[in-house]
UniProtKB/Swiss-Prot annotation:
Residues 155-174 bind DNA. It comes from the Bacteria. Phosphorylated by DesK. It is found in: Cytoplasm. It comes from Bacillus subtilis (strain 168). GO terms for cellular component: cytoplasm. The gene is desR. The keyword Transferase does not apply. PANTHER family: TRANSCRIPTIONAL REGULATORY PROTEIN DESR (PTHR43214:SF42), TWO-COMPONENT RESPONSE REGULATOR (PTHR43214). This is Transcriptional regulatory protein DesR.
Amino acid sequence: MISIFIAEDQQMLLGALGSLLNLEDDMEVVGKGTTGQDAVDFVKKRQPDVCIMDIEMPGKTGLEAAEELKDTGCKIIILTTFARPGYFQRAIKAGVKGYLLKDSPSEELANAIRSVMNGKRIYAPELMEDLYSEANPLTDREKEVLELVADGKNTKEIAQELSIKSGTVRNYISMILEKLEVKNRIEAITRSKEKGWFK
């Protein structure tokens, strides 16, 4: 019998997932929680075979919990609405065995759990495509400017550091916002982090 812990902050989905998996003859949901910390505490104490987690939960996220549980022997499966390459890359680094999207068919989750228990890794196909197809649209100089923005530097400081005029820096920032399809500098930094484009 495969023992499973589920961490999901949407109560209705948490209940539905638990009910669905308990219908499987070879699976038993032994615990449920609504935060990443719930998952960390339960897994360390009870050591279930599998832990299924959402990413965005109050307090500790699913990715932070996965990083903390990397060496416990529990197989982590991320189940999320976020098909973001940056999240996916971080999950892979954390040793996550499965990464599925919430719009996947329900039987796919049960099959993924069995596959993971057999030593396989199961990742949503569309994420694998995105991982290899989504290139950073920024030029090297634009990347340099954005990294300085992320370091908290203002237009004047960036101009001094790169030995260019403030107006040129503003032009670069306008191009960055346009290429990343965002409204401001904060969104540009967030988008680049999500895509895993920062060094």
